[in-house]
Amino acid sequence: MNILVLLPANDRHRAILESSAPGEDFIYTSSDAITREQVADADVILGNIDPALLTACEHLQLLQLQTAGYDDYLAAGTVPADAKLSCSVGAYGQAVSEHMFAMVLSMIKRLPGYHDLQREHRWEDLGPVTSL
């Protein structure tokens, strides 16, 4: 089985991947450097690939996206009919929640405005701030 990995993977990550599927062939590349031959030979693709390249697939069994979104891969004929498409829905929920919470706090404390004033070397009061 040929497993095409488009995710950035250091030596530790590669060892983990390869130990999970001993004896399988792993090919590491990036979305920018991928070739049609690599796609044609892949049984499994881990990572996001240009959907147009999927027409080169000859025996793809699984496409595991690294993102939650998958709309670009839903067009008819994009992913071979007998292949499974998997994405990372739910993997980023906590990080997105924390980011939104940080942005709300930033806005109620007027941090963007104070940041702009600081860059301009102006020390002014932007008015009252609210509290949670």
Task: Label every PLM stretch briefly.
Residues 126:
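Active-site-proximal loop/helix segment associated with metal-binding centers of metalloenzymes
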Residues 41-120, 129-130:
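Phosphate/diphosphate ligand-binding glycine-rich loop within oxidoreductases
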Residues 1-44:
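N-terminal glycine-/charge-rich "phosphate-binding" loop or analogous flexible N-terminal tail
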